[in-house]
Amino acid sequence: TQYIRFFMDSNRYTAFEAFVNQYKEIEVFHKVSGQACYLLVSHFTDVTFPLFIESLSNWGRYSVETFVADKLNHGDD
């Protein structure tokens, strides 16, 4: 799982949103306020993720956090 914060380099929001919505691997696609313009949660493979990021970089800048392990413990053990 990848968590992507995306920062637009232009105001072509509608075209960018159409681009992102082409990908079935994207589970969450939110327009946000704060540091980033959008927050995405995706499930690309190690092979397809670099291809997506290369295309994404045509639209702006991004930062990526990759899911490693769920550490939430509600004491149910």
Regions found by a protein language model. Give the residues of each.
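A compositional/biophysical signature of low hydrophobicity enriched in polar/charged and small residues
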Residues: T1-D77
